């Protein structure tokens, strides 16, 4: 097999890995890789930094996706071409329900499709839903580690500012079609905003792949917009969850 276009890897490079942990941040990918046995950097191309290591005796990939659905879809597609079948996303998030605390872990069952990339895989009537067993592994991981978590629906937006109804911007303006949208999602029980899960869930379900998503809460937007918590500690907690979930799935 020839090398895939963006990652620059061929199937032999992954040594049979069928599970990938997919953060957005390349630096976070590097940090996660250090929890694997014998980690090796396979590629560093644009936002895609790819590492291979061993977990419970199985080959596991860690690949950063960058921010948002379009680049996430590239990473997932090319990893799938290389044999990966399960994708565990790890990220950070802003909660919009008042009972959720900073530092809590959110496990996404499904996503509101506020993105555009997912529509290139299935129409809007198709649900952006996680894989049941991969999501159950995330839940089990939180329980195993005695970490406070919530499970529910996530709003997944293409944009960080207008799509999440943020007014702390250059213009301070949000288009009328999005004004009041945060309150609407709150009233519908949506837990949080992020920017990748709708694309990840939709494309994986449509392509016969498995996906789950976990995110650490940096801020609760019902109280404030700017995080003032220790990002590093929240990252450590969410990384612990995704690694434990991977172990559950790998057996």
What do the PLM-derived regions correspond to, one by one?
Residues 1-144:
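Metabolite-binding pocket within alpha/beta catalytic cores that recognizes anionic/polar moieties
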Residues 26, 94, 155-161, 199, ...:
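Glycine-rich beta-alpha junction loops
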Residues 39-44, 146-153, 250-251:
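Flexible, glycine/charged-enriched surface loops at secondary-structure junctions
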Residues 80-81, 186, 205:
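Non-catalytic positions within long, well-ordered alpha-helices that form the structural scaffold/packing
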Residues 85-86, 191, 210:
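Short acidic/polar active-site loop segments enriched in Thr and Asp
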Residues 129-189:
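Active-site rim beta-loop-alpha module in soluble metabolic enzymes
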Residues 198-230:
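Zn-dependent metallopeptidase/amidohydrolase metal-coordination segment
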Residues 221-251:
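His/Asp/Glu-rich mid-to-C-terminal helical/loop segments that flank catalytic regions of hydrolases
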């Amino acid at each position: 097999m020839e090398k895939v276009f963006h990652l620059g890897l061929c199937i032999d490079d992954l040594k049979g890995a069928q599970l990938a942990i997919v953060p957005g941040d390349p630096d976070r990918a590097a940090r996660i890789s250090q929890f694997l046995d014998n980690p090796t950097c396979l590629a560093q191309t644009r936002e895609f930094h790819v590492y291979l290591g061993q977990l419970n005796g199985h080959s596991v990939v860690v690949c950063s996706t960058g921010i948002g659905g379009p680049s996430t879809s590239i990473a997932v597609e090319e990893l799938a071409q290389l044999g990966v079948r399960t994708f565990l996303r790890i990220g950070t998030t802003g909660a919009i329900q008042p009972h959720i605390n900073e530092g809590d872990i959110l496990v996404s069952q499904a996503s509101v499709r506020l993105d555009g990339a997912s529509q290139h895989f299935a129409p809007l009537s198709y649900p952006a839903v996680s894989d049941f067993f991969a999501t159950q592994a995330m839940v089990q991981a939180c329980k195993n580690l005695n970490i406070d978590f919530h499970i529910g629906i996530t709003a997944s937006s293409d944009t960080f500012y207008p799509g999440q109804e943020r007014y702390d911007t250059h213009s301070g303006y949000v288009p009328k079609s999005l004004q009041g949208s945060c309150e609407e999602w709150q009233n519908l029980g949506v837990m949080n905003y992020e920017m990748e899960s709708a694309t990840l869930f939709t494309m994986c379900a449509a392509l016969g792949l498995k996906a789950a998503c976990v995110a650490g809460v940096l801020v609760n937007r019902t109280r404030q917009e700017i995080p003032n918590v220790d990002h590093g500690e929240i990252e450590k907690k969410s990384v612990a969850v995704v690694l434990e979930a991977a172990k559950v799935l790998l057996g």
